């Protein structure tokens, strides 16, 4: 086992990358092979038989999909590569967003027979949002239907990307025999089954013309991105390979191009050149712009990737660990941190001590003495730190940009089977919601039930599974419930007056407020229009708090209210009797009064559903979607497959996975993400409200 500890590499030799893909594109296998060839792992794991290193949670081993982004470190040609494994299933896009925040670059893995699939589009858009430079790997070149040029074209058509193949395959499907490097103009062949022996040789005659044509394409595309190459190209001068690589690296880091590689990870072909590509084209922390942060005065500060700067890091993942309690994963942006020292959590305003620092290798771990700028590391000992918190040096407190997390759309009631399970359940739910900000757990005060909510049925299934397995807590599970919301349609004003006089000090709070509908994507806004101090400044936050709390339970059916702007217009106070509590109660009275007059309505989550199906099942699937109140937007053809894009209310989608399987004999697949909230039809709303 090569010891990583001693090898603190120079920053320019560090790569922090993610491997992102659609659920079946072979991402885990690609990661596995990377670990194998970089000497971190002595037997080749396979998803199909459940031995893959990165998929280390039991549930992942059974389902064959990656759920938790484990961070792994490995060495290749005296560079250190930190890999963050990201899930490909749409219910876990939160994990993907989180990983993308702390990466410098990514490898996008595609299935060469399918090209860009729906989830690849989602993940690609998220990577665009965080400006993550990417290279692409067309995997599964040995699969039936593999077509390199078609797959590359889908990157243009569906992702609006600028793919530049730096390799082409020799053959495809059964006859896939290796790859051609279009920059060096050499063929690469693998001599043994596990792919450890490879040779560079002359390009076979039958591929020569195609390779020359594709190299010409490559030169043309690179010339468009680089003035120096453009000049040489137009003058017909020789363009050196180093110059091509340099220009391509610059374009990749600026997100103007995506170099494309190909191979078959499962057949152990193409992985070492992909590793070279990670070093060649993806950025080191030094190539990235400085990270932005804000100091205590709210002024922007630039955080430079240097060991000499004060320490700054972002916690991007909390993982409950059966052995050590809680692991906090963070990315160090500047400075250096020794184990046993204190860090300042500027988000919470608290000091915490780090007892151990660990480099993770999927589910094995190595203790290290210190970490520094660029590192991705797990720490033990941080009790109060949550996902998205900034850790820094107390002498230079700074807050990095906050992470934003989506609201859950689906809930189920769960109850412990025995009294003994009750205590275990509340502890486990606390740990799980620390770990995953898109998962919520709370007790419904009216019914006394424990409600858990998340991003989809699979998300909650996995949570329930973990409760049983990891936390040994037996629970009974109710039917999934839709997370409805309520809102108002018209502006309304109301007065809230709370006065109590009962011996000694009284209570006095008085507000006049206006409530207006705003865009439903915004939960709540508050505006203070008080002039002349008719309500003193110190009570204003209590007014906002009162409205926020009241908005948690709407007037129609007790669902949280969204899309409301609260404006505090006027009011009065009493020198002695006024208190924060009195203003909080007065504000909630005004809110409840106004909402009744503002034409409240019930809202439901509308999901963007994309079904991919062989043509022969399309008619039945569309008929079924229509029976679910769907609005079918578009139909697309992709080879022999049809893609149906529709908007469907979530309440109609329960159990859809099973129904779709029976409609298509298991051949159709679908993805579903929240699009927006919309008004529930009146008849249905009456039913929901009467419940």
Curated annotation (Swiss-Prot):
Determine if Protein biosynthesis is one of this entry's keywords.
yes
Residues bound to GTP are 21-28, 85-89, 139-142
- Subcellular location(s) per record: Cytoplasm
What biological process terms from GO does the record include?
ribosome disassembly
Q: One GO CC annotation, please?
A: cytoplasm
Q: Which residues form the tr-type G domain?
A: 12-286
Gene3D superfamilies registered for this protein in UniProt: 3.30.230.10, 3.30.70.240, Elongation Factor G (Translational Gtpase), domain 3, P-loop containing nucleotide triphosphate hydrolases, Translation factors
On whether DNA damage is a keyword of this UniProt record, the answer is no
Arranged from A to Z, the UniProt key words for this protein are: Cytoplasm, Elongation factor, GTP-binding, Nucleotide-binding, Protein biosynthesis
Q: Which SUPFAM superfamilies match?
A: EF-G C-terminal domain-like, P-loop containing nucleoside triphosphate hydrolases, Ribosomal protein S5 domain 2-like, Translation proteins
Q: Which cysteines are joined by disulfide bonds?
A: none
Gene Ontology molecular function: any one: GTP binding
Read off the NCBIfam families from this record.
EF-G, PRK12740.1-3, PRK12740.1-5, small_GTP
The record's similarity note reads: Belongs to the TRAFAC class translation factor GTPase superfamily. Classic translation factor GTPase family. EF-G/EF-2 subfamily.
Q: What does this protein do?
A: Catalyzes the GTP-dependent ribosomal translocation step during translation elongation. During this step, the ribosome changes from the pre-translocational (PRE) to the post-translocational (POST) state as the newly formed A-site-bound peptidyl-tRNA and P-site-bound deacylated tRNA move to the P and E sites, respectively. Catalyzes the coordinated movement of the two tRNA molecules, the mRNA and conformational changes in the ribosome.
| The protein's name | Elongation factor G
